[in-house]
């Protein structure tokens, strides 16, 4: 049958890797693992999706990825270049695995995949990513800790800049679904002036 055939292929004498689809959400990988394959030669890869709104939803992505992660199999997903001009399909909506990633900067896509703890390898689905994108991708992938890109207001003060960028922020344990709270700066800089300015209603994404 198909599963025993895949098992035999993982035990090839040449070290050839056998890559199977991660995105379907079936028990295919469980059936293969029941035959005790050589897991050094068995890899999983998510699909990429060229049409807008056809990419994986996050919950399904996690569900599918965990099926492979529980066996400690190497996993891969695709991110989308915004400088690329072509892919395997005529449409040019990008070529990512997660639909949520389609319009995000490539570094943000990579950071998200890394933070899931579910993906080992990340590839660019469309061609060709720019040198700047590849550099940003590599920096995000190899970063010692996660970072958030912050676009500052022109009126930012020097004390605010120091509080934002000269610290390793830690996320409070009593976490919220709506905000990331880093509170030690109010201890470190309690004697610095932080006058109110650029006041307006806070919207999603504000710091």
What are these regions (language model features)?
Residues 6-31:
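A generic, well-ordered mixed alpha/beta core segment in the N-terminal half of proteins
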Residues 2-4:
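Short, small-residue-biased leader/transition segments that mark boundaries at the very start
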